[in-house]
């Protein structure tokens, strides 16, 4: 399985993702740079975590306007699986590939606590 690992300036989990896809899942990952077109032979795409563009405005908002996102949207229309992890998820929301919006938390500070989630 050919998997594209999208790399933005500030991504810092792309090498970890590449290793897991290659060495654990025995897939064929390839780095896909934010300013280059996606290869046409991909079976899936992963947007890994990190701090794309330093998360200066809102998490993922600048990356959501990178040239590669148009290609990600095109493959999404074809039904090719896309996974966003951490900042990658935020990029998918900011780009409109996932529904909803990202909101600031009540404290306006980083929070690390367990949250219960029910998937319906």
Label each region the model flagged:
Residues 1-85, 92-113, 118:
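N-terminal beta1-alpha1 cap of cysteine-dependent amidohydrolase-like domains
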């Amino acid at each position: 399985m050919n998997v594209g690992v999208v790399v933005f300036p500030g991504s810092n989990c792309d090498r970890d993702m590449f290793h897991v896809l290659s060495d654990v899942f025995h897939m064929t990952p390839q780095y896909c740079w934010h300013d280059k077109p996606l290869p046409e032979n991909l079976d899936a795409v992963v947007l890994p975590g990190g701090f794309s563009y330093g998360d200066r405005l809102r998490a993922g908002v600048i990356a959501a306007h990178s040239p590669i996102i148009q290609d990600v949207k095109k493959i999404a229309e074809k039904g090719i699986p896309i996974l966003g992890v951490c900042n990658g998820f935020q990029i998918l929301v900011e780009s409109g590939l996932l529904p909803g919006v990202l909101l600031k938390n009540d404290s306006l500070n980083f929070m690390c606590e367990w949250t219960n989630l029910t998937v319906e």
